[in-house]
């Protein structure tokens, strides 16, 4: 916030990226949302019942992954820890498209084999900043965007061919 106050996070779960709702928790969440909407809109308009998803997993079609190189040289992919530049490794998030997760894992391995320098937010040194993947459920198309700190991407054709060999879709 501009006035110096910290913004409180609504999500109090210990690891919001990896947390998955049980069916019962999901139903309670829908009831809570219904109650909140009825409170907010009572007197203005009738509130139709909130319709939940039949399968509330693997629906997110946009996946973004950050990378970090550990001291032992291993490259991990994941999300930034809240309020830091520290990357927390995540695999198999229950709301993100499974194809995108597999591509991120393979890209992480390709970065290691191509000896790519992972960008360090604190030092400002490195090449690979993050990867964004969009999937289209209707067409099956997948778009991979590699965000770099420089317009020069060494061995970009070889890297793209290696990725296409692993994921021709």
Segments (PLM) and residue ranges:
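Accessory RNA-recognition modules of RNA-modification enzymes
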Residues: 1-169
């Amino acid at each position: 916030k501009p006035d110096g106050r910290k913004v409180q996070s609504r999500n109090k779960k210990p690891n919001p990226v990896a947390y998955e709702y049980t069916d019962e928790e999901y139903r309670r969440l829908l009831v809570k949302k219904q109650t909140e909407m009825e409170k907010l809109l009572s007197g203005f308009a009738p509130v139709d019942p909130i319709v939940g998803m039949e399968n509330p997993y693997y629906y997110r079609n946009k996946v973004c992954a950050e990378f970090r190189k550990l001291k032992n040289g291993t490259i991990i992919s994941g999300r930034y820890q809240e309020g830091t530049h520290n990357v927390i490794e995540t695999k198999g998030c229950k709301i993100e498209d499974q194809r995108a997760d597999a591509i991120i894992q393979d890209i992480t391995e390709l970065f290691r084999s191509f000896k790519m320098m992972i960008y360090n937010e604190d030092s400002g040194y490195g090449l690979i900043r993050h990867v964004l993947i969009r999937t289209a459920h209707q067409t099956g198309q997948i778009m991979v965007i590699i965000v770099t700190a420089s317009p020069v991407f060494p061995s970009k054709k070889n890297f793209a061919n290696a990725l296409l060999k692993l994921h021709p879709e």
